[in-house]
Amino acid sequence: MAAKFILDNKKVVKHMYESDYKVELEKYIFSISGEIMKKYVRRVAVDTKAQEIDITLIAYFYQCALSSSLIQWVATDMKTDPKAITRRIGELMDGNILLSLKRSENLEKFTQNFEIE
């Protein structure tokens, strides 16, 4: 996970964040967060009839939340325990992804064209 990489390389990551490589670091964190969330949301979606576009949107929403949290954590000198925070957020948000996927089953087809990277 991205947090493990950051924890294992705190000094390097902090230097990157405070340098010209900040944008690259943010892109990397965003990319890793996306892979994690896409896999997780797809796994939860297996037993639903959620629309493909909604699966993508839900994963993207949580990718943004996760990556922003990690970037903010780096920006504030990584003083809090990311595992404890992640665990707590997980407990607070438990079931929301499945609930959103179930809602997708009953929504009209989404016809707007867009691409998320």
What are these regions (language model features)?
Residues 1, 14-15:
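Two-component histidine phosphotransfer core
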Residues 4-5, 22-46, 56-60, 64-68, ...:
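Amphipathic alpha-helical packing segments from all-alpha helical-bundle domains
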Residues 13-14, 40:
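Short, structured loop/turn "capping" segments at alpha-beta junctions
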Residues 18:
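Phosphate-coordinating loops and pocket residues in cytosolic domains that bind phosphorylated ligands
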Residues 42, 55, 64, 68, ...:
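C-terminal peripheral helix-coil segments that are non-catalytic and often amphipathic
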